[in-house]
Every structure is written in structure tokens, then in C-alpha cells.
From Swiss-Prot:
One of its GO terms (molecular function) is transferase activity. SUPFAM superfamilies: S-adenosyl-L-methionine-dependent methyltransferases (SSF53335). It comes from Nocardia uniformis subsp. tsuyamanensis. Keywords: Antibiotic biosynthesis, Transferase. This is Isonocardicin synthase. The lineage of its organism: Bacteria, Bacillati, Actinomycetota, Actinomycetes, Mycobacteriales. InterPro entries: Methyltransf_25, SAM-dependent_MTases_sf.
């Protein structure tokens, strides 16, 4: 008996998040094996799973785990003060089976349909974030899984180096990891925050201070474009679409564009396709397979 046939006999349930006190932005959908699953993001084992005698750190970050899944979506309802998702509940065995299928398929779509609902705090201030040594360390730590995954995945997809541009480079650690994986790559970063740019200049070939809506490099000049600024709590959805268009214009035909981040990506893979970017990957997995995270790898043209 398959996981889905076991679930079909379950009575429906619902998960509710209010806008005033709840966190609708923590609800995620996972499209796998022809069905849509709903889950709620909580703290995950980071960067890897628990091991005997060595429990992992718990961190609320980009990672989602099988235990966070709730059920098979039947419908959702967006009301005046809350969002509700009606679903057929999953047992632990069904969660594990479907999650393993998602881990095995990088085209599995993991997304947050209510990322812009609820009482959210916009993190980005005019002129970028204030940066301290501690906050820079925290940012780099929360990005460790992404830095480990993306360069290897790029190699699997045939990337061999060239010009790599990060439209919101933060401390520069992410693009530095790409440069290390592909020697000879010219790494060019840009960030709204002068403090971030100062840190990035110690790691990258170039780092420019400025808004990503005005990219610092010429059109069609990059072999790889990284977007880590199209996320909830950072920008609005319309702004994310505009920023993607600006960044993607700097990618050459046949080049790669990567979308990811600590918080939900606001641009859908369908929007990317409509913009001339072909999805090669929609989600990434940790080496152990214990967790998934949003990670679009797109080919231009």
C-alpha cells in the first residue's frame, strides 16, 4: 500500500494561522509524487541531523524536515483575519516516504504561498542592514548549508567558472565559496549596505555598493548570477520581480541564475519560466537527506 492510499482514508483536518498573532509565512507547500503537501516550518537540526551522543543545533532557517509535514492539501481558505489549509493528515511513515521522494527529485517545488501575510517585520532598512561582527558571523553560519550545496550542484550542471555576480552579496562568503570551487572565476558582489561591502571586499575580486535594481555590471556579462535578496522580510513581491529582471539581464544566454535565501523566496518557479529562465532545480537537500530548502537553479534562454 502506498503512502497516498493510506492517507486517503483519513478524516480531514486543518491548520490555521491568524494574521495578528500567527505566522502564516511559516506554512509551506511541497509538490511531490503528484500531490501537494502542507507543512509548518519550525526549528530544524542544523547543519546536519542528530547523531548518537551528539545532538545537532536547532535553528529556524531555510531548512524543512519530514516531521514538519502535516498532510495532503485538499483546499485552502484565505479569510479576513486568518488563513486555513484543509488537509488529510499524514502518519510518520507517510511523511518519511514522501519526503524521501522529494529529496531524490531536485525539481520538487518547495514554496511558501502565504509568505507576505501576517504581522511581519521588514528587516531591510534604507541603506541596508547594520552589521556587527556577531551579526556577520550569524549570517555566515545560517548560510553554511547553502554554501556547501550550490557550488557542487553547479558543477553537476556543467558550470565551469567565468564571471560570477551576486546582486546582494552580504559578507561575500557565499560567492567566495563559488570562487574556491571554480578557480579562476571572477567574483563580483554588490550590496546596499556599505558595511557589508567593506567585508565583501576582503573576499571577492570586486564589491560594489548600490541597489540591486541598478546592477554594477554590464548586461549579459555574467556566466552565473546569484540572487539572495528576493525574499520575504527583505523586499515586497513586486520589488522581488523587478530585482530578478534586473539581475537576470546581467546573465548571458545559456548562463545560470540561482535564487535562494534564509527566508521564503517570493518569486515562483512559474514566474521564472515566464521570464525566460528554465528551472533545472527547485529545491536542494542536505547531504544526509534530513532536510530540504528552496534553491532555484535556472538556465537563461
Amino acid at each position: 500500500m502506498t503512502a497516498l492510499s493510506r492517507v486517503s482514508g483519513q478524516a480531514p483536518d486543518r491548520v490555521v494561522e491568524t494574521y495578528a498573532e500567527g505566522k502564516p509565512y511559516d506554512l509551506f507547500f511541497l509538490d511531490v509524487a503528484g500531490v501537494r503537501l502542507v507543512g509548518r516550518k519550525t526549528e530544524a537540526a542544523y547543519p546536519g541531523p542528530d547523531r548518537d551522543g551528539l545532538p545537532a543545533e536547532r535553528l529556524k532557517c531555510a531548512l524543512v524536515e519530514a516531521r514538519m509535514l502535516l498532510g495532503v492539501v485538499e483546499r485552502d481558505q484565505v479569510a479576513e483575519d486568518h488563513v486555513a489549509v484543509f488537509h488529510r493528515p499524514l502518519g510518520e511513515a507517510e511523511k518519511a516516504e514522501l519526503f524521501a521522494a522529494a529529496v531524490a527529485d531536485p525539481t520538487t517545488d518547495l514554496y511558501y504561498p502565504y509568505a507576505q501575510l501576517g504581522d511581519r517585520v521588514r528587516e531591510t532598512e534604507e541603506g541596508g542592514w547594520e552589521v556587527t561582527d556577531e551579526s556577520a558571523r550569524e549570517l555566515d553560519h545560517a548560510e553554511e548549508v547553502l554554501r556547501d550545496h550550490v557550488p557542487d550542484r553547479l558543477a553537476e550542471l556543467g558550470f565551469r567558472g567565468g564571471v560570477a555576480y551576486d546582486a546582494a552579496c552580504s559578507t561575500g562568503a557565499f560567492l567566495q565559496a563559488v570562487g574556491r570551487r571554480f578557480p579562476g572565476t571572477r567574483t563580483i558582489g554588490q550590496d546596499l549596505s556599505p558595511a557589508m561591502v567593506a567585508r565583501a571586499r576582503t573576499r571577492l575580486d570586486e564589491a560594489h555598493c548600490g541597489d540591486g535594481i541598478r546592477p554594477a555590471i554590464p548586461e549579459a556579462s555574467a556566466d552565473l548570477v546569484v540572487c539572495r535578496h528576493l525574499n520575504a522580510f527583505v523586499v515586497g513581491t513586486g520589488q522581488a520581480h523587478d530585482l530578478l529582471a534586473a539581475a537576470a539581464s546581467r546573465c548571458r544566454e545559456g548562463g545560470l541564475v540561482v535564487l535562494l535565501g534564509h527566508t521564503p523566496v517570493l518569486v515562483s518557479s512559474q514566474w521564472c519560466e515566464m521570464s525566460g529562465l528554465t528551472p533545472l532545480q527547485r529545491s536542494g537537500a542536505t547531504p544526509s537527506g534530513h532536510a530540504l530548502f528552496q534553491c532555484y537553479v535556472l538556465r537563461k534562454g
